[in-house]
From Swiss-Prot:
Phylogenetic placement of the source organism: Bacteria, Bacillati, Bacillota, Bacilli, Bacillales
GO MF term (any one): GTPase activity
Protein name: Elongation factor Tu
Subunit structure, as described in the record: Monomer.
Ranges for region G2: 61-65
Chain's gene name: tuf
Taxonomic source organism: Halalkalibacterium halodurans (strain ATCC BAA-125 / DSM 18197 / FERM 7344 / JCM 9153 / C-125) (Bacillus halodurans)
């Protein structure tokens, strides 16, 4: 069987289903693949069991079960993630194992918003899922129109509470199970949902279009030529002759010009996101640039020491701590390529954090690092990972 060619002409977006346990996330995922495959003849219908039996993956030492499915509408190609358990969602969103350009929030019309509905909305806000579309599921079980309107209002209020535009978010009423069973009236609702996703979730800006940034992994001198910083370009493009800033670990950023770009010992005119390169830096001594700093387009990223973060603390079984920790705990924070010591403050009313918990915390690093909202990090202690986090907001 020849492999199908990936169609690049369509724009691509990463999305996922979120919401309370048993509200129908996986059934909806199966229904989307089934209805779209049936209507367009493209893509593969996935059964509930195939999605639900997702294999475990390890992301930064953390065990996560995630199902990845793909499907396409007339306008777009989608990669869709669905997680079986609540803990898997928390881990997935915090580690960025599956970056989402948007999410489908599934709420059972029969039950209304539940604790995990709230928690997933909060997580989406914290980790930077920019857009949510709501699927009000199990509407076939609710005869009362007023009740549906009440649930919809509740969901909209909840979204607004976490700074999503609750009044504008599309809410589609449907039944994933009925659609999956082939009921034409409910199949239409799946088509309606995907039209809303196509329309409401903007085409994501690809990494190559963003401002240039490369974490420095290694530095060496070439006699007679200068200093070379190596690393993998995280985003954007770098052209020979571009001015860049060296940021992090020092109070002051230093400006320099890139006089050469090499990949696999060959000279390039430019490098882009995903390339492993060496950048030759004009007028910079080997001592002035080090692992843990980043090269970036001037003015696009600044070094910070204080931030709020959403963190998942590894369980004992995942190789994490065996005991809780408290405020003023001082582990290492591993950003991109380096460790920096940081001091943790827990929120008011949170006495301690147990292994396996997720928590919002404030961190103060002892040296400034190039960070922004959405930057991922690991928390380490004696060389082993004890937590994973994402910067939710910069304080200083």
């Amino acid at each position: 069987m020849a492999k199908e060619k990936f169609d690049r002409s369509k724009t691509h977006a990463n999305i996922g289903t979120i919401g309370h346990v048993d509200h129908g996330k996986t059934t909806l995922t199966a229904a989307i693949t089934t209805v779209l495959a049936k209507r367009s003849g493209k893509g593969v219908a996935m059964a509930y069991d195939a999605i639900d039996g997702a294999p475990e993956e390890r992301e930064r030492g953390i065990t996560i079960s995630t199902a990845h499915v793909e499907y396409e509408t007339d306008n777009r190609h989608y990669a869709h993630v669905d997680c079986p358990g609540h803990a898997d969602y928390v881990k997935n969103m915090i580690t960025g194992a599956a970056q989402m350009d948007g999410g489908i929030l599934v709420v059972s019309a029969a039950d209304g918003p539940m604790p995990q509905t709230r928690e997933h909305i909060l997580l989406s806000r914290q980790v930077g899922v920019p857009y949510l579309v709501v699927f009000l599921n199990k509407c076939d079980m609710v005869d009362d129109e007023e009740l549906l309107e009440l649930v919809e209002m509740e969901v909209r209020d909840l979204l607004s509470e976490y700074d999503f535009p609750g009044d504008d978010v599309p809410v589609i009423r449907g039944s994933a199970l009925k659609a999956l069973e082939g009921d034409a009236e409910w199949e239409e609702k799946i088509i309606e949902l995907m039209a809303a996703v196509d329309d409401y979730i903007p085409t994501p800006e690809r990494d190559t279009e963003k401002p240039f940034m490369m974490p420095v992994e290694d530095v060496f001198s070439i006699t007679g030529r200068g200093t070379v910083a190596t690393g993998r370009v995280e985003r954007g493009q770098l052209n020979v002759g571009d001015e860049v800033e060296i940021i992090g670990l020092e109070e002051e950023a230093k400006k320099t010009t890139v006089t050469g770009v090499e990949m696999f010992r060959k000279l390039l005119d430019y490098a882009e996101a995903g390339d492993n390169i060496g950048a030759l830096l004009r007028g910079v001594s080997r001592e002035e640039v080090q692992r843990g700093q980043v090269l970036a387009k001037p003015g696009t990223i600044t070094p910070h020491t204080n931030f709020k973060a959403e963190v998942y603390v590894l369980s004992k079984e995942e190789g994490g701590r065996h005991t809780p920790f408290f405020s003023n705990y001082r582990p290492q924070f591993y950003f991109r390529t380096t460790d920096v010591t940081g001091i943790i403050q827990l929120p008011d009313g949170v006495e301690m954090v147990m292994p396996g918990d997720n928590v919002e915390m404030t961190v103060e690093l002892i040296a400034p690092i190039a960070i922004e909202e959405g930057t991922k990090f690991s928390i380490r202690e004696g060389g082993r990972t004890v937590g994973a986090g994402v910067v939710a907001s910069i304080q200083k």
